[in-house]
Amino acid sequence: MFLELKAQATSILKDAIQKAGLEIEDSELYFETSSYADLASRAAFRLASLYRQNPKELATRIVSAVEIPDGSYIGKVSASGPYINFHASRRYMDKTVATVLEEKEKFGCGAPKDKILLEHTSANPNGPLHVGHIRNSIIGDTLARILRRAGYDVEVQYYVNDMGRQIAVVSWACERFELDLSRKSDSAIADVYIKANVELDKNPEYVKEIDALMEKVEAGDVKTIDSFYKAVSLAISGIKETLLRLNVVHDKFVSESTFLKSGAVHDIVERIKATGRTKTDKGALVVDLSDYGFKKTLVIQRSNGTSLYTTRDLAYHEWKAGQADRIIDIFGADHKLISGQLRATLNSIGVKEPEVVIFEFVSLPEGSMSTRRGQFISADELFDRVTEAALEQVETRRPETSEEFKKQVAEMVGIGAVRYDIVRVSPEKSTVFNWKEALDFEKQGAPYIQYSHARACSILEKAKEEAAWNSSAEIDPSLLVEDTEIDLIKKMASFDRVIDLAARELKPHVLAIYARELADAFNQFYRFVPVIAAEDEKVRASRLALVNCARIVLANSLDTLGIAAPESM
């Protein structure tokens, strides 16, 4: 709705500027949201510099030339100093309510757009995911959901490291130590991986065995490849379980060994050589990217002729470039250098570069995490802790409900709290996940938003029981004139703007902020305006319809954030 409002404002402003005898590029209209209007333009500033005139006088001159078409979403245009302010019409409000009720879960969806291939998580299969990994998963999954709602055709991939040094250690460990298969498979892999690293630290001669395994895999030794595959499959199976609990699903798992077997790795190395930017450094083949601003060279082949993860990643990205219109990678801050080198190398051979979202790390109050040293709290343990704490709150708030209900709500609230608390922070900022704060119903996190949705459901259910509401009855949105009603309608109308902004800038936190603000607007409305208790029947019906609208947009917001929307809490 808001995007249509902006489109109409753009058309009105362009016509007025032309009628005022002025010219400006569309990109120089400079629209922004404002606390004084529904939309404001800074075009007068640009025109002032072009025509050497006072921006305030220009704004007044333009506004005097404004003509608003009948039925427009723009009700009034005014000048406030150099700013040109646009105010929504009553029609805009009424149409928003009608559109939400008509489109329901489709409200806020954009027109069909390009295909995007988005890669996220891609953690090494040497143990369970920890909280550091799941920030990648949550950012990636939320972005995929946002992009889909914006209209993009999104395929989500997990790039499986099934042949690097760490996997050689995992395979070696599985042969040397007994796996405890009574444990979750990825945890069993972590146990032997940690033992293996202790052995390797104590006995450096074992490193030669790891090197030999890597050479065998590179040479295509079937037995070694099979042992690698079995170890990786066990770890990935456990990782999938964890991701599913987090409400994260990948469309495809792509193994890096695929590109070695197909010859793609060899081909891309030869093409990079053909650019004339490779050289030998201590027997290894490196790429000089100094003209791209990188002082450090990129190693693409070891001195023994074997490829590196980076080399195989280059081949993977070349393959991805042929699968979609856009490629998006979600990487941690420790990949900032290598992702830049990867983009530069791809550019040097004429391959489409990925768009990269870099995120800083999330930690727990307990400190840092390392699978190799065995110093980590797994995502599974974190989920258990959070849902147990959520269960305590549910038992306190709803002691009369069944155990099954309490556990279901605790899982929805706990996992929702994890997802929201991590995604609400801009990716480029580091954060500490504090589960007590994340679960605080008064802190306006996921539980607060979920509770707002449940409250809307409860109001509608109560209205049905009291025969005060018929969802199919005709309503009159023009009766919704209270300030809190108008604020709520306008906040719902801006859902498509938020989706568009988050999709364009690849910043999922803006949707998290919006969802909280929407919950605020709904709760303010319910606090100050009687709904079921409204005396006028038509007003009551319209307010109940507004509650239903809020329920729909809250549910859409939560769904796009990958968070469950409970009907009762």
UniProtKB/Swiss-Prot annotation:
| UniProt subcellular location | Cytoplasm
**Enzyme kind, highest EC tier:** ligase
Q: What GO biological process terms does the UniProt entry carry, in alphabetical order?
A: arginyl-tRNA aminoacylation
Against InterPro entries, the record matches this protein to: aa-tRNA-synth_I_CS, Arg-tRNA-ligase, Arg-tRNA-synth_N, Arg-tRNA-synth_N_sf, ArgRS_core, DALR_anticod-bd, Rossmann-like_a/b/a_fold, tRNAsynth_Ia_anticodon-bd
Q: Could you tell me which Pfam families the record lists for this protein?
A: Arg_tRNA_synt_N, DALR_1, tRNA-synt_1d
Major localization class:
cytoplasm
**Catalytic activity annotated for this protein?**
tRNA(Arg) + L-arginine + ATP = L-arginyl-tRNA(Arg) + AMP + diphosphate
State the UniProt keywords alphabetically: Aminoacyl-tRNA synthetase, ATP-binding, Cytoplasm, Ligase, Nucleotide-binding, Protein biosynthesis
GO molecular-function term, one example from the UniProt record: ATP binding
Name the domain of life: Archaea
Q: Gene Ontology cellular component?
A: cytoplasm
Where is the secretion signal located?
none
What Enzyme Commission number(s) appear in the record?
A: 6.1.1.19
Kindly state the positions of the motif 'HIGH' region in this protein: 123-133
Q: According to its UniProt record, which protein family does this protein belong to?
A: Belongs to the class-I aminoacyl-tRNA synthetase family.
The protein here is known as Arginine--tRNA ligase
Query: Which species is the source of this protein?
Result: Methanosarcina barkeri (strain Fusaro / DSM 804)
Q: What taxonomic ancestry is recorded?
A: Archaea, Methanobacteriati, Methanobacteriota, Stenosarchaea group, Methanomicrobia
